[in-house]
Amino acid sequence: MIEISARRVVGSPIGLLSIAASEKGICSIDILSPRSKLKDFSESRNAQEHVDLASKQLNEYFSGKLRRFSVPLDLHGTSFQQKVWQQIAKIEYGQTLSYGKLAKAIRNPAASRAVGGAVGANPIPIIIPCHRVMGSTGKLTGYSGGNGIPTKKKLLALEGISFK
């Protein structure tokens, strides 16, 4: 279980973002809906520094000044999910990758559906840019953050990515 030691809610062009950190780094970003509920936590200075840096970098990303994040992360998931998330983090700003190509990139070409599950379980959207993963035809598929596909469209448009 991840121990959240700092959290901040910040505004963005896609809605409110809840940034949470442990002592090690950012452990989640939630794109909040009006019904979202936040859990209590005990604050730590180290974790607060991670949240401060993530907040600054997200602001720079949304203003078009930042293309690659450098904030420390504290990712928790299965080894398969970790592989998928690490590969997603390599997708360049303004580029996309299909689920099938992502499966090939992790050397598991038959795992497109499992890759989709790992993409949907990404705890740190935007910083781990799962919005850049598309269907094989370039069609927009699901997005678990915020309002779903409309949120994904906004993120892709921000990066100048065309979609169907």
Spans of model-derived segments:
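Short Lys/Arg-enriched helix C-cap and helix-to-coil transition segments
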Residues: 126-133
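DNA major-groove recognition helix of helix-turn-helix
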Residues: 119
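Basic nucleic-acid-binding alpha-helical/helix-turn surface characteristic of O6-alkylguanine DNA
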Residues: 1-110, 158-164
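Conserved hydrophobic "DFG−1" position in protein kinase catalytic cores
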Residues: 21, 134-135
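Helix-turn-helix DNA-binding helix
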Residues: 112-115
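…primarily DNA-binding HTH/wHTH and HhH modules…
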Residues: 136-164
